[in-house]
Amino acid sequence: MTESRKRSNKMTTKEIFDFVDSQKTAFIGSVDEDGFPNIKAMLAPRERDGNIFYFTTNTSSMRVKQYLSNPKASIYFYHRGRFRYTGVMLKGTMSVLTDQETKERIWRTGDTMFYKKGVTDPDYCVLRFTAASGRCYQDLKTESFEL
């Protein structure tokens, strides 16, 4: 047990990211043109590099338009067990990436189901979320953290 875990019950940064990496679904949040939050369930991130997460979506989607207009974003992961609920919300910014190098790196076999023209489909893009802070809920306790 780490020294910080002995002093409090909060999750370490490693434990937070291990938890996030084990989830199959992510909820992403954007801000619409009227300033209201919009939440959408998505498949888990395709890739994570530290506090940076990569998702795929349609370039023509409402969400892409919202992120281009206002990059403030959040992502949420949760696990509901029989007796225990754990949730992690991350706040940061979302960038819309359309460069071919990133699209090819994130592309997976089977993606043509969503993007008919393949990796060069103009309606395929990558969302890059950069987390700056967050909140963690576990064992009836909520704690904020900075990344």
Question: Predicted segments — roles?
Answer:
Residues 46-83:
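A short mixed-secondary-structure module that forms the rim of ligand-binding clefts
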Residues 19-33, 73-77:
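A short, Trp-centered hydrophobic/proline-enriched beta-strand micro-motif
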Residues 27, 52-54, 135:
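General beta-strand recognition
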Residues 22-24, 49-51, 69-73, 84-92, ...:
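A generic structural signal for short beta-strands and their flanking turns/coil linkers
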Residues 42-43:
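Conserved beta-strand in the GNAT
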Residues 2-27:
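Active-site-proximal "nucleotidyltransferase
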